[in-house]
A protein has these predicted regions:
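Blade-loop segments of beta-propeller domains
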Residues: 92-100, 112, 116-150
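Beta-propeller domain segments
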Residues: 27-82, 154, 166, 201, ...
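Asp-box/WD-like beta-propeller blade repeats and closely related beta-sheet repeat scaffolds
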Residues: 130-132, 136-149, 155-156, 161-209, ...
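Predominantly a core beta-strand signature of beta-propeller blades
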Residues: 85-86, 129-133, 180-184, 234, ...
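Surface loop/turn motifs at the tips and blade-to-blade linkers of beta-strand repeat domains
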Residues: 88-93, 134-140, 184-196, 249-253, ...
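Conserved beta-strand element within WD40/beta-propeller blades
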Residues: 109-110, 158-159, 215, 271, ...
């Protein structure tokens, strides 16, 4: 992980945004009230977490409390706000992770476990896809998917494996790869920048003008507890030309930026981040933020704007005042994964251009948190600092877990599509007009 980057110009999109004054009447939980668990989750509940709300390290012991997964109980169903409804679009997928919408409306899904990309097309009279097929297979833990160039007529679909970036020729409407796989970022022996181990997901997005590609690479370790660990070019967001050349670090000190997204109004790069473990139930907050070019976000020595990690006392004092505070602090251990922005037209206007992010759920906390999809309100492309429960209900009254959201995408008809790797399901959320 390097700490400096060269400057480059980023392009912004000049697009209008509707008035969101009607969404400002929500009551927001703040302070200690914002630090709850799954029993306080419900659609419409808003929270704001600040650095001042955070406890000192080790106020609670670190616990291993992973999700106890069970089949979906009879009658259990995701909960969404009044006026919305949830449908089971498809189930029995194998480890569905990221989902993206192609320009023609097809849904591309990374099934990371079996190493393939699946395509779903249309919607049948029974509510499921009309076409369900495999676009490409033989991949290595694929996660990120992006079409290039951005816009209505892409020529390639890019895939981020755990140790490389590849692409396939693509013509609008292709249901299977129409040409051979092409290497974009190679994993060279002993020097591959995207080598496996540690945090394995790699997301990728293109700048709005298509001139740059961003790839997120999580850390090898939790808090750099092993100084011999291979952390070079990890815990970073990397920037490349679309052909894989001109690699550089765009932002550093980001422990595990699982999800990347480009805001449709500003063109800003955003990320959703899994922060470090083993400091207690309410440390360190996961977060969602706009990514500042050349920015340093603290890992592993600091967190949340210059707070020293107690496992690295006195290390790198010269960096303390350079650590950026993220835009939206979530609860600790949410395991925030993918993020998208609502660019459809079927939700109420106050949702336009707001973020939706999947919270996969905790393991390092005595009381479970996460296991839901949240809304991230924005105003003219700037996050308000709050987040709101949107899709909950994946935890039983006994604390067992039957669903874990991963991917989020806006379908061509404006529905929000959510992958769930616990049940192998894609959920479809639409507004009831």
């Amino acid at each position: 992980m390097l700490l400096t980057t060269a400057a480059c110009a980023s392009s912004l999109l000049n697009r209008s945004e509707p008035d969101k004054s009607s969404s400002q009447g929500h009551q927001t939980l703040t302070g200690q009230s914002a630090l709850g668990d799954w029993t306080s989750d419900a659609p419409g509940v808003r929270r704001r977490v600040t650095v001042a709300d955070l406890p000192r390290p080790y106020q609670t012991r670190s616990v291993d409390n992973g999700a106890h997964l069970v089949p979906r109980p009879e009658g259990a169903w995701p909960k969404v706000p009044a006026g919305f409804k949830v449908e089971q679009f498809i189930t029995d997928l194998d480890n569905p992770r990221e989902i993206v919408t192609a320009p023609n409306g097809d849904l591309f899904i990374a099934e990371s476990g079996p190493g393939r990309i699946r395509v779903l097309r249309g919607r049948s009279a029974k509510g499921g896809p009309e076409v369900n097929t495999v676009f490409a297979s033989g991949l290595r833990q694929p996660f990120g998917i992006a079409f290039y160039p951005p816009g209505p007529s892409p020529e390639f679909v890019y895939i981020a494996n755990t140790d490389s970036v590849v692409r396939y020729p693509y013509r609008k409407g292709d249901l299977s790869a129409s040409g051979a796989q092409q290497s974009v970022v190679k994993a060279l022996p002993g020097g591959g920048r995207l080598r496996g181990g540690g945090h394995w997901t790699r997301d990728l997005r293109f700048r709005a003008d298509g001139q740059k590609m961003y790839v997120s690479v999580g850390s090898f370790t939790n808090d750099y507890e092993n100084p011999n660990a291979p952390e070079d070019h990890r815990a970073d967001i990397l920037e490349f030309n679309p052909d894989g050349s001109q690699e550089r670090i765009y932002a550093a000190g980001i422990r595990n930026a699982v999800g990347l997204a480009i805001h449709p109004v500003t063109g800003d790069l955003w990320c959703s981040v899994n922060e470090r473990d083993a400091l207690g139930d309410n440390l360190v907050p996961d977060y969602i933020t706009r990514v500042k070019e050349g920015g340093f976000y603290g890992w592993p020595w600091f967190y949340m704007g210059g707070t020293q990690d107690p496992r690295h006392p006195g290390e790198h004092p010269e960096l303390k005042n350079k650590v950026l505070t993220p835009d939206v602090l979530l609860e600790s251990h949410y395991a925030s994964l993918c993020i998208t922005f609502y660019n459809g037209s079927s939700f109420p206007k106050e949702f336009k251009n707001d973020g939706f992010a999947s919270e996969h759920g905790s393991w390092n906390r005595a009381r479970r948190v996460g296991y839901k999809v949240i809304r991230v309100p924005t105003k003219r492309g700037v996050p308000t600092g709050e987040f709101e429960d949107f899709m909950t209900g994946f935890v039983t009254a006994e604390g067992d877990v039957w669903g874990r959201p991963v991917g989020v995408a806006v379908a061509s008809d404006g529905a929000l599509m959510v992958t769930d790797d616990a049940s192998g399901t894609v959920w479809r959320v639409q507004h009831s007009r």
